[in-house]
Swiss-Prot record:
WD repeats lie at residues 27-65, 71-112, 115-154, 163-203, 204-242, 244-283. PROSITE patterns: PFU, PUL, WD_REPEATS_2, WD_REPEATS_REGION. The keyword Cytoplasm applies. GO terms for biological process: proteasome-mediated ubiquitin-dependent protein catabolic process; ubiquitin recycling. Residues 494-585 are annotated as: Disordered. This is Ubiquitin fusion degradation protein 3 homolog. It comes from the Eukaryota. Belongs to the WD repeat PLAP family. Keywords: Cytoplasm, Repeat, WD repeat.
């Protein structure tokens, strides 16, 4: 049934021709952004790798026939093709705001149009090829007369159509209405133009409008990031019907194909929609099928002359789909295609399950091998029960229970929050927090409030407090311990309040009249600290362990058949024999990746970015892009924030002159803490480009210390997520690492600390990498780079103590457990270097790390 024009039409599935893969074209090194088809059947693709390529089918294969290279850094975002009187023309919309015009017989552009100020994200040729339309991030639509365009001389009389307030993403024309056009924008509106005059404004989408299809002079369709197709009446500028996608969160393109509409979008799918005029004359659009492709995003789709469908993927490929059995791909291609799709869907399913059940997986260090066992914790459940299940699954002794429970709480904020009673928020420095502790600095000063939330790690809360009050980083472990202890007290207090009974000697969980013998959940004995015997009741742990606690050892009695008596069972870390090649302590090896510089709202960075943006010519950011960057300072890193506009903002702003890059890198180091943006900028070619850009900045040795600080912080924060870790762990260290080490020796303490933190994170990434596979070279290279930079320093007294401690952490971690690397360090006289570093610190934690390094050299 037809709806009122505002509700979603329910989707049905009907039979349709079965599409299968015909060809997979490895077209571009990065995203294939746009497609076009010539009258002769040639396929054209434009990519983010700065190329446009022509593909012709010869026999059963697609072969590249032409390639047009764009200048370095000028990615292709839109293309349009036209047959003119003097030959074909290819129009290429580029990121710098230019439109390059190519033709036959020469590789260089016939002309370059410069009227747009920013990225040209859409191009359209009208049906008679008399005019081209272009849309840009500068919010303008420009109409270009192209009938007499040639390679020698022609002066354009362009028509600029202002009206949209944000980027223009799609264009269309009416075949039966000359000089009448449509434009769709990020401002959520569609405008109908006659020349440069706005005839109508269509409002109905709730997000960016990305695609347009004209059906007749009186009707058209639009689609966008709200996941809907809307059927519009031109005369009244009103919605006729609205249809919801079955596949895409965002719809990126929409194309007509015989009796179907094709849409591509965010989820790497191709959706088929059947069009039916309906008995009542109303148009009905029904989602019939969704084809999964291996790629993450599908940017565009075009119908070929033989009715096959070409789909542009974010993986740089072009996927050709067909219904003709004679054009079906060979079995090996089909198998590979299906395997990639299955892998993608499997990963998606696992991700959805994990999100649905809110399950967190952490690695538990039981014996001398780091990250050996997986522990899965479901948010909102009792960490004690989780620890019991973990022990049972892995056949571990019950005396590990307390240690594993604490381990879970230390690493998972939701576990610490379990059973915490809700209380009134406290306000510190104008912000609300769950709790706050008083910290006395001495010297007669009043206590400072150290705030923390139950959903954040003690380490992070302590780091925030240290940064806010400019305290030594060496006090972070102590402050984090205070917060952790307070969380434990709060948790116990909440448990007591819930039970309703508390014994002043044993605490909660004692015997309660008429209550279940094990309802307390713990049943702690005031003398043994372990589970007591309860007649006719199962052990308080929830599974039968066969013993209760020994009052002297806290462990169970000897049992000949017990699995823990095999000689190979796990034991507490404190009971392990000391291994001088693997020293352990609060800071050794590096306990986790350090994230630096997250305090504050970034008002100064935002103001500076806007100021410097006004000075840019080719790479000026539009309001959409600036707003996207501003959001980075207000969204938590757990939001997994990402958007194409934000990505493009960085791609453009990183092209600014070096002296203008300080605010850009300030935003980038925040972006790298978000999983999606980290994955985007640190993956494959983009990752190598990022590393190259950071190297270029440090090589230029800018006078601006803040710029060098932010380069080091970008490197450090890149280790926040796996893709960034893999990038820098696999990067050639001979160039970048020495540059970072050089910053450690700078006279500015803030630069020393930022660079040393980058090195510490680097060492941890290489250590974790070596645990998975033997790869000696990178650790050796990092060690050599550090030693080459610091071995000639006679005294480190001018360095900040915090930076020295981080540097020592980097050294001990890169050597940790690897006899070959330790031997290399020993041959390079690291004991003497460690002694000089030890002399420069007064803090015991720093001195202990230096002693650990010396002890390691004695072990080989």
């Amino acid at each position: 049934m037809a709806d009122d024009g505002l509700g979603d039409v329910p989707m049905e599935t009907e039979s349709m021709p079965q599409y299968t893969i015909s060809h997979v074209i490895e077209a571009h090194k990065s995203d294939t952004k746009a497609l076009a088809v010539t009258q002769g059947g040639c396929l054209i693709s434009g990519g983010r790798d700065e190329t446009v390529k022509f593909w012709a089918k010869k026999g059963k294969q697609y072969t590249k026939t032409h390639a047009f290279e764009q200048p370095k850094g000028i990615t292709v975002n839109s293309i349009a093709y036209a047959e003119l009187a003097d030959g074909w023309r290819l129009f290429v919309g580029r990121r710098d705001g230019t439109i390059a015009v190519f033709g036959p017989s020469q590789a260089e552009p016939y002309a370059i149009f410069n009227e747009h100020k920013q990225n040209v994200c859409c191009l359209h040729i009208n049906e008679k090829a008399t005019h081209m339309l272009s849309g840009s991030w500068d919010s303008n639509v420009i109409i270009w007369p192209i009938t007499e365009l040639n390679s020698s001389s022609f002066t354009f009389q362009t028509i600029v159509c202002p009206g949209h307030t944000l980027s223009v993403w799609a264009l269309a024309s009416f075949p039966d209405l000359p000089n009448t056009y449509l434009s769709a924008s990020a401002d959520k509106t569609i405008r109908m133009w006659f020349g440069d005059t706005t005839l109508s404004v269509f409002k109905g989408h709730t997000d960016v409008v990305r695609a347009l299809v004209v059906l007749s002079s009186s009707h058209f369709l639009s689609a966008g990031n709200d996941g809907h197709i809307i059927h519009w009446d031109v005369a009244s500028a009103s919605i006729l019907r609205k249809f919801a996608t079955q596949a895409h969160e965002f719809i990126y393109s929409m194309t007509l194909s015989d009796s179907h509409i094709l849409t591509t979008g965010e989820d790497g799918t191709l959706e088929f929609w059947a069009i039916d005029g309906g008995k009542d004359g109303n148009l009905a659009i029904v989602s019939e099928a969704v084809i999964q492709l291996p790629t993450t995003n599908t940017w565009d789709a075009k119908v070929l002359l033989n009715s096959d469908i070409a789909v542009a993927g974010s993986d740089g490929r072009i996927y050709i789909m067909t219904t003709d059995k004679n054009r079906k791909a060979d079995d090996d291609i089909l198998d590979a295609f299906d395997a990639e799709v299955v892998a993608k869907l499997t990963a998606k399913t696992e991700r959805m399950k994990q999100e649905e059940h809110e399950t967190v997986t952490i690695k538990v260090d039981i014996d001398d091998r780091p990250t050996q066992l997986n522990l899965k914790y479901k948010k909102g459940t009792d960490p004690g029960l989780c620890a019991q299940e973990f022990l049972s699954e892995n056949n571990l002794p019950i005396h590990y229970l307390e240690e594993i429970t604490r381990f879970i709480k230390d690493r998972i904020p939701e576990a610490r929050a379990f059973d915490l009673k809700s209380g009134k928020k406290v306000i510190v420095d104008g912000k609300e927090y769950d709790y706050a502790l008083g910290v006395n600095f001495g010297k007669g000063e009043p206590d400072k409030q150290m705030p923390f939330n139950v959903n954040e790690s003690p380490q992070f809360a302590a780091q925030r407090f240290v940064e806010r009050h400019q305290l030594p980083v060496s006090v972070i472990p102590s402050l984090a311990g205070m917060i952790s202890q307070e969380m434990d007290k709060l948790s116990k207090g909440a448990a007591s309040a819930q039970s309703g009974y508390e014994d002043p000697f044993t605490g909660p969980g004692r015997y309660v009249p008429q209550g279940s013998s094990n309802s307390g959940g713990h049943g702690a004995d005031p003398f043994t600290g372990s589970g007591r015997y309860v007649p006719q009741a199962s052990n308080s742990s929830g599974f039968d362990t066969g013993f209760s606690g020994d009052p002297l050892t806290g462990d169970g009695g000897y049992r000949a058949s017990a699995p823990e008596n095999t000689g190979s069972h796990a034991v507490p870390l404190s009971s392990l024999p000391q291994n001088k090649k693997k020293p352990r302590g609060p800071l050794v090896p590096v306990p986790d990746f350090y994230i630096i510089g997250l305090a504050g709202k970034g008002e100064k960075a935002i103001a500076k970015l806007k100021e410097l943006n006004e000075k840019q010519d080719a790479f000026q950011l539009n309001p959409d892009q600036i707003n996207g960057l501003e959001e980075l300072f207000v969204l938590p890193t757990s939001s997994n924030y990402s958007s194409e506009v934000t990505q493009s903002a960085f791609e453009m702003s990183l092209q600014w002159p070096v002296e203008h890059l300080t605010p850009v890198l300030d935003f980038l180091r925040i972006a790298l803490t978000h999983h999606s943006l980290n994955s985007y900028f640190c993956d494959r070619e983009r990752g190598q480009e990022l590393v190259g850009r950071l190297i270029a900045i440090l090589v230029s040795d800018p006078a601006d210390v803040a710029l060098k600080v932010l380069v080091c912080r970008c490197i450090a924060n890149a280790f926040s997520h796996p893709v960034g870790r893999n990038l820098f762990a696999s990067t050639e260290l001979s160039t970048l690492a020495p540059l970072v080490v050089r910053q450690v020796l700078n006279e500015k303490t803030v630069l020393q600390m930022s660079a040393a933190t980058a090195l510490a994170n680097w060492s941890l990434a290489l250590l974790q990498q070596s645990e998975q596979c033997e790869q000696l070279g990178p650790k050796e290279d990092l060690l050599r780079a550090i030693l080459n930079g610091i071995e000639s320093v006679d005294s480190f007294g001018y360095l900040g103590e915090d930076a020295i401690i981080r540097l020592l952490q980097a050294l001990v971690t890169v050597m940790w457990g690897d006899a070959s690397v330790i031997r290399l360090a020993k041959n390079r006289n690291i004991a003497q270097i460690a002694a000089r570093l030890k002399d420069a610190v007064s803090n015991d934690s720093g001195k202990n790390i230096a002693r650990d390094i010396v002890e390691m050299t004695y072990a080989v």
